[in-house]
Amino acid sequence: VEPDKRVTAAVSLISVLQQAQSEAATAGAACTDLAYAIRRLVRGLASPRDGARQGFGAALVELLVTFPKEVTVESVLTLMEESMQLQGSMKGPEERDMLFGRVFTCAAVIRSARLATLAAKPRAALVERLVKELLFCLGKKTFLQELGTVILCELLRQRPAVELLAEAVRAGHERGPDRDEDDEGGVGGGGDVEVVA
């Protein structure tokens, strides 16, 4: 999907959701349509279809920017964890999609710049959560290292280096060694960097 088309689709979706939210009697909470859209976008980030991740990612960024009260970063990350669970019975391509989905969800949260709007304590907790998640995914598959590094650099630009380093060290110590050296899907992984470029 071409970038211009993704942006157009995201803008159109946001417009519809703004109308639905304004007509709903759910002040401060997501209306039914908005809640459904959140679930659909997050789950869509694990889609194996070409261009789907970029499209869903662009829409999720705009949704997070547009609905700061109705859509929390915590709820998005929780949806990610619930809908993209890794299981031992998964085949290689399915696990690959789940891992890419988790990385792309983190990317959307970071690109929305929502972290900068939070108070220091909750922001630190969320940054640590994001760093842990990204390090976990990078440790599972080597073909995610390039994409994950780009996203971590974006996060670094939003936080004082000393704070982020401390969080990364804590996350690394807690994660432990669990690297999977299987490079399946490595060729396709490079193109996905577009979402965070």
Language-model segments: residues:
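Eukaryotic alpha-helical solenoid repeat scaffolds
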Residues: V1-V11, V16-A29, A35-A197
